[in-house]
Swiss-Prot record:
Alphabetical list of InterPro entries matching this protein: Cardiolipin_synthase, PLD-like_dom, PLipase_D/transphosphatidylase
Highest taxon in the source lineage: Bacteria
GO annotations of cellular component type: plasma membrane
Keyword Chloroplast found: no
Record organism: Streptococcus mutans serotype c (strain ATCC 700610 / UA159)
Keywords, ordered alphabetically: Cell membrane, Membrane, Repeat, Transferase, Transmembrane, Transmembrane helix
Membrane topology: Multi-pass membrane protein
SMART domains, A to Z: PLDc
Protein name: Uncharacterized protein SMU_988
GO molecular function, one term: cardiolipin synthase activity
GO biological process: cardiolipin biosynthetic process
Record SUPFAM superfamilies: Phospholipase D/nuclease (SSF56024)
Lineage per the UniProt record: Bacteria, Bacillati, Bacillota, Bacilli, Lactobacillales
Length: 461
């Protein structure tokens, strides 16, 4: 037990994670220590970690880093320049101009545009999604993919291994292969070896011909387009990139794909064959990996909060915070920044929702304004600040996204779509009820007790 305590105290874990593990180990020293070893040694993921490391190094030289663009950004906004420098150093991610960004305020609008763009594909289609479920949405997309295969377009589909326990059969990848689609399962679940929840591919990426890319919270299942109802109205968001910035998503996909077959052929898919797009602002697509000690997703969010002067508006389905993120939210509000958070009115998971409410009192006391979307569930992951910067992607405000999953997002500075993002937030706000100390007191006792108990193990959720 002493060895376990020494390991925890000297680890790079955040304070709450260390406390959580101590609460597990102290009353149950043998079982707790074995569980710690099981989760931290990653026996089922050592090969994956090695492959990810190799593919990450292999792909870095292909990121086209234009120093001139960076200098222009420095001249217009030094603080955003500093963040761009960080993203380049942490993952090699370049900053782009000449990239048009279109914002979608719901799954329905994204779905319609996806189909239009898929039908235009001439060379390749790459899809990487956390959830794919058979139904109207996936059925229509699959029909287009089959058509494109017949036309000679290379189609690749990759989905997370957890789907084999939920929405897709174990042989689904083989079924796709039979119709000419190259298919991969990322990190299949291995009983008693996989930790199940860790190292999941939570990313959502669609790339077409290195010309167009989609990113955001919307998976390929019918609830995301409100074709079926789950937890009321499903509020989600996405962005479409056209132009130079698409290359980063092409490379992100190829990097993850290569972990399953060590195929490091990247250059043929990076041909710049699109008409030059003139667009305002700067775009930085980026990803985050749980296999290093760099919390890229969280660091970007915290930077937005720390640099904000007027407002930060946030949409997130979950709110399970480490001390750094909680402090950043509080400090921004205490500095006079208008911090607003919209969360679900109807949660998809009751325990995490009860846990989120344990963070509400301290945030409210600091001046953070919290709202719940009354028509249903908010699955969007959006930050927008001061009319000049925003992030749309897959990164939730919880430990799973910030520490344990593979994620991706699009950082935007002074792009034209910021107007649409802010307008959508305000429209969503009109459909939301404000949370106050008074409303929290009216919560069910069971909800309060669940949140109180579960907060002790928040980092494990």
């Amino acid at each position: 037990m002493i060895g376990s305590v020494l390991y925890l105290v000297n680890s790079q874990m955040d304070t709450l994670s260390i406390i959580t593990w101590l609460l597990v180990i102290l009353p149950f020293p043998i079982l707790g220590t074995l569980f710690l070893i099981y989760t931290k040694q990653d026996w089922g993921y050592r090969e994956l970690k090695s492959l990810i490391k190799k593919s990450t190094q292999a792909i870095k030289p292909y990121f086209q880093y234009d120093q001139r663009i960076l200098y222009k950004l420095k001249e217009s906004h030094a603080r955003t320049y500093n963040l761009a420098q960080y993203l380049h150093r942490s993952g090699g991610f370049p900053v782009y101009k000449n990239t048009k960004v279109t914002y979608f305020p719901n799954g329905q609008s994204k779905f319609e545009e996806m189909k239009k763009q898929l039908l235009k594909a001439e060379k390749f289609i790459f899809l990487e999604y956390f959830i794919i479920a058979e139904g109207l949405m996936w059925g229509e997309i699959l029909s287009i993919l089959e058509q494109k295969v017949q036309e000679g377009v290379e189609v690749r589909v990759m989905y997370d291994g957890m789907l084999e326990l939920s929405t897709l059969s174990f042989d689904y990848a083989k079924r796709l292969e039979k119709i000419g689609i190259k298919a991969k399962v990322f990190s299949p679940i291995t009983p008693f070896v996989s930790t199940y929840y860790n190292y999941r591919d939570h990313r959502k990426i669609l790339v077409i011909d290195n010309k167009v890319a989609f990113n955001g919270g919307i998976n390929l299942a019918d609830e995301y387009i409100n074709q079926i109802e789950r937890f009321g109205y499903w509020k989600d968001t996405a962005v479409m990139l056209e132009g130079e910035g698409v290359a980063s998503f092409t490379l992100m996909f190829l990097q993850m794909w290569s972990t399953t077959n060590k195929d490091y052929e990247f250059a043929p898919y990076l041909t710049q064959n699109f008409h030059e797009i003139v667009a305002n602002g700067y775009v930085i697509p980026y990803s985050d990996s749980p296999l290093d000690h760099e919390k890229v997703g969280e660091n970007v969010y915290i930077d937005i909060l720390n640099q904000a002067r007027d407002y930060v508006y946030i949409m997130t389905p979950y709110l399970i915070l480490d001390s750094e993120m909680e402090h950043a939210l509080q400090f921004a509000a205490e500095r006079g920044v208008d911090v607003k958070i919209i969360m679900p009115g109807i949660p998809d998971k009751k325990v995490p929702f009860a846990l989120a409410k344990r963070y509400f009192p301290a945030l409210l006391d600091a001046g953070v304004k919290i709202y719940e979307f009354t028509p249903g569930f908010v699955h969007a992951k959006v930050f927008i600040a001061d009319d000049i910067k925003a992030v749309v992607g897959t990164i939730n405000l919880d430990y799973r996204s910030l520490y344990h999953h593979f994620e991706c997002a699009t950082y935007m500075y002074q792009t034209d779509c910021l107007v649409d993002i802010k307008a959508d937030f305000k429209e969503t706000l009109k459909q939301s009820r404000r949370v106050t100390r008074s409303t929290l007191q009216k919560e069910k006792i069971s909800t309060k007790l669940i949140g109180l108990v579960v907060k002790l193990v928040a980092p494990l959720l």
